[in-house]
């Protein structure tokens, strides 16, 4: 019997896949547990429609991420921080500070998407990697300046 998996099943496959299983396994376990549904013509068409909608949605997100990446690539963020006379910071500039500075510039990015090569502990120019989508990332220039 052909079924459409609704959940990931370790021995069969991932959600959304159409697999062929024995009638008893489908009728007595997979379907009652909500792990699968019968692969009727209507269900297969609905699955195909859902996949197309999902692909469209992912493409829209990718286009939006590329637009944000272009905007970020051209920016130079200025992050103020308290520093001593030698240029050493009192504390560090982290991804949270960079995310806050981006938010001020009108770009809302989750701090966990920002990657620094090393913690920023001195005044100067640095670069940070911002992962915006599965295959879209941007490098942003960060200038750490003395406060006040």
UniProtKB/Swiss-Prot annotation:
Give the record's GO biological process terms.
translation
Residues crossing the lipid bilayer are none
Q: Which GO terms describe its cellular component?
A: ribonucleoprotein complex; ribosome
- Supply one GO molecular-function term: rRNA binding
Q: Name one Pfam family in it.
A: Ribosomal_L9_N
Has UniProt tagged this entry with the keyword Oxidoreductase? no
Q: Does the keyword RNA-binding apply?
A: yes
Q: Which UniProt keywords apply?
A: Ribonucleoprotein, Ribosomal protein, RNA-binding, rRNA-binding
Coiled-coil features, chain-numbered ranges: none
Function summary: Binds to the 23S rRNA.
Regarding protein family, the annotation reads:
Belongs to the bacterial ribosomal protein bL9 family.
What is the designated name of this protein?
A: Large ribosomal subunit protein bL9
From which source organism is this entry?
Prosthecochloris aestuarii (strain DSM 271 / SK 413)
């Amino acid at each position: 019997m052909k079924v459409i998996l609704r959940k990931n099943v370790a021995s069969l496959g991932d959600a959304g896949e159409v697999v062929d299983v024995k009638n008893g396994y489908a009728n007595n376990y997979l379907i009652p547990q909500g792990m699968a549904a019968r692969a009727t013509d209507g269900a297969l068409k609905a699955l195909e429609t859902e996949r197309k909608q999902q692909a469209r949605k992912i493409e829209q997100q990718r286009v939006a991420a590329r637009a944000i990446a272009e905007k970020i690539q051209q920016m130079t963020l200025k992050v103020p921080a308290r520093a001593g006379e030698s240029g050493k910071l009192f504390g560090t500039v982290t991804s949270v500070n960079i995310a806050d500075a981006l938010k001020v510039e009108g770009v809302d990015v989750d701090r966990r998407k920002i990657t620094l090569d090393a913690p920023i502990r001195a005044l100067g120019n640095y670069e940070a990697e911002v992962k915006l989508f599965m295959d879209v990332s941007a490098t942003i220039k960060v200038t750490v300046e003395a406060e006040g």
